[in-house]
Amino acid sequence: GEFVLFGPGLAQDIMAYKLALYAAVKPEVVVLGSSRAGNVRAAFFERPFVNMAGAATDLESLRLLVDRMLAVHRPRVVLLGLDFWWLTAGAPAGRPERIVQPSLLDASTLRAPWRWLVQGRIAPADMLAPLQHRLRADRYGLEAQLRDTGYGPDGSLYEGAVLDGRRPAPDHAFARTLRELESGSGVWAGSLAPDRERLEAFAEICCRLRSRGIRTIVFLPPLATPVLGALADRNGGDAGWLSALRQGLLDCGVESMDFSDPRVYGSGDCEMMDGLHGGDVIGASLVRDMGDRQPWLRDMLHREYLSHVLRERRGLAAVPDERLTALPEADFLGLHCAKKRRGEATPRF
């Protein structure tokens, strides 16, 4: 089918978009989680697939998403990417009852283009694009039009203009993530110790899935190695905080796979998109590793494609896809990564 991207500049209701996609496809395999789980592609699987990542941003929105999904269709498999800060005391809890469709006519929305202009998100020439018929029919929203950034036909996340260097990486050398971590704001508020009440709330969501006969794999998405180091420093030099989190989950009856350190499975910082998001080569690594551990999942994977990706694209963030960009991958994070093309991976969508 046609390759389109949905990448709104405004705070649109991603959950509604993903649920509409889910209802249309009725997938056997589903990915849940924040945008950090958005790097898992339909091409990795031999079964109908939808990536719902980005529709949930905390435990409460995850619970709401699962309720709405199960009211429509029951998948066979859920791969659930867990952001560890969803389970720590002091992090934002979320208020699902406030999840409403944003108005396109309120004052904040009408001022948004001028705010983006001041912030440098758009250039003066971009303001004229609609009048000059320069908008692309296969790109929906500001991020998709200007940055080739958004969710693709399978629901997975693409970041084209950052990948090829047309736009600067917002988290160059992971500086933004490290700065936010040091300030202790937002998701970095509070301690790294897991909160028992939140652990139990997450376990209840997993139990809901499994009680419907849905095989569920909980996994911790990757972090850049400097971010892992900064988190260990924040914990008094002790890197065991992740083990404590996984043990807390286990005590509540939830097993998990820890992919937080890319070095453990042969990846690295050059395969990251920023401090918190791995590229789709890392996504391929995670899925193949899951299949190696769970034979029932292995039979659903396109193993030949995964092997090709991991053989040809190690050390790079993305599989070439000319529908997104025809330009080669750049050293967009400024890490002195060798970004030479080593062969094209055959697209399979």
Regions found by a protein language model. Give the residues of each.
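Short extracytoplasmic
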Residues: E2-V31
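Membrane-embedded segments
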Residues: K26-L117
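Second-shell loop/turn segments in exported
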Residues: N51-A56, W188-D195, A232-N235, M272-M273
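Secreted/periplasmic serine-hydrolase-like ester/acetyl group-modifying domain
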Residues: R95-R212, R303-F349
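Extended hydrophobic/aromatic segments used for targeting, binding, or gating
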Residues: E200, E204-M273
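Short alpha-helical segments and helix-capping/turn motifs at coil-helix boundaries
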Residues: Q12-K18, S61-R68, A201-F202
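Soluble non-cytosolic domains of exported or imported proteins
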Residues: A56-E60, H73, P168, L192-L199, ...
